[in-house]
Amino acid sequence: MIKPRTPPGIMELLPREQIAFQRMLDVIRRNYERFGFLPIETPVFELSDVLLTKSGGETERQVYFVQSTGALANAAAAADEGAENGGLPELALRFDLTVPLARYVAEHEHDLSFPFRRYQMQRVYRGERAQRGRFREFYQCDIDVIGKDALSIRYDAEVLAVIHAVFAELGIGDFKVQLNNRKLLRGFFESLGVAEGELQLAVLREVDKIDKRGADYVRDTLVGEGFGIAAEQVARILAFVALRSEGHADALAQLQALEASVGASATLGEGIAELREVLELVKALGVPERAYCLNFSIARGLDYYTGTVYETTLTDHPQIGSICSGGRYESLASHYTKSRLPGVGISIGLTRLFWQLREAGLIQGIAESSVQAMVALMDETRLDDVLDIARRLRIAGINTEVQMEPKKVGKQFQYAARAGIRFVVLAGDDELARGVVAVKDLVREQQFDVARDELASTLLVELEQAKGDAVRRSWSFLLA
């Protein structure tokens, strides 16, 4: 007999946790749509030569390739005959949602309206080394605004407002969107003589590690043989990236002070101007100033970011790390089209976020179900009545489960409690003879009678009240 088990790097949830995960997905989707983003889905696998526009490297080593049994047999036969392998398998599982988006926009460019505002919430796959908190299959929840030839910096501010709306409704604790601009960093490095090119990109990647590895690590790396930057210059870099703002006015003041002290090179001036405009628009969009700040160490390790960059963290749980990140890029689909398609976007890695929240004790004792009511069956002769009651509840929009076999009432209550069903409807001989049914509220441990024809309307009121209770408890995301 084969032992049932899931592959390493997979998060599989029991129903109660799956409901909580699904509700997080629903909140994210709802807020994306409120800001006018349109849904798309792309295939779980893409053509290998399309997905892997840059051959080799870490990305290709983590890609899962897809091969049919027929193709495998043909490859094996060819190998037996001494033939060379025909190259990579034809298909590969997507490793993020950005590359499929680039292919999608390039392929459908003439059918889309620009700026194209898209959201996508799907699983992606990476051959990560199996270890705690690292996943091979995980959900990403992305938004991007794609322009044609140009895209206003105003969208960068709107994306920050989307981040705020999502995490405010998720209710998982206070959070802060940390904001920076790659042009500002590049301009500052240029003022120190760290010229644009591979060296500057490498320095940016090291600076981005400062919150994880610490200033001493970054200092030793930049002064070391690989970089050879003078200690005095490294000290200025570390002092610069240590800057943080406290409040909206302080953020603007820091930009002004930076402009005066360093001198506005063309690149630095662009970065300051873009950040200043984003800050002003974020205020107009109603994002509270406690929810964002400038953090000059945020660079994002991916080299295609060219302007605004974001990282979001939980204020009281910084050990969780970034829970949402992204930024602006100049050309999304340069490998697939000659059109210039600048954009800005962010991604929420929901699988990892959910796992970390659970590990940190921020999701506790979820006792809810998608089933809103259960109709108990105590007597076989009352099955028709029970089915009719359930049918009427469903017509009223109430998710209703029926016990199809008669059991003792106590056992049916136990089942409902274990399943997280709050309301149990009892329709026994005594109740039906009086034209009523009994409703047991398992949370409040109260039972009351209600006229049979008023059951649906009464339960709708009770469910609305229960929903209000859940909101006051951050709907089951109970903070430690």
UniProtKB/Swiss-Prot annotation:
GO terms, biological process: histidyl-tRNA aminoacylation
Keyword DNA damage: no
Gene3D superfamilies: Anticodon-binding domain, Bira Bifunctional Protein, Domain 2
Ranges in a coiled coil: none
Main location: cytoplasm
A Pfam entry, by short name: tRNA-synt_His
Annotated keywords: Aminoacyl-tRNA synthetase, ATP-binding, Cytoplasm, Ligase, Nucleotide-binding, Protein biosynthesis
One CC-aspect GO term: cytoplasm
CDD domains: HisRS-like_core, HisRS_anticodon
Gene Ontology molecular function, alphabetical: ATP binding; histidine-tRNA ligase activity
Keyword Ribosomal protein: no
Classification via InterPro entries: aa-tRNA-synth_II, aa-tRNA-synth_II/BPL/LPL, Anticodon-bd, Anticodon-bd_dom_sf, His-tRNA-ligase, HisRS-like_core, HisRS/HisZ, HisRS_anticodon
Catalytic activity, reaction form: tRNA(His) + L-histidine + ATP = L-histidyl-tRNA(His) + AMP + diphosphate + H(+)
Location within or outside the cell: Cytoplasm
Enzyme Commission code(s) on record: 6.1.1.21
Stated family: Belongs to the class-II aminoacyl-tRNA synthetase family.
NCBIfam families associated with the record: hisS
Protein name stated in the entry: Histidine--tRNA ligase
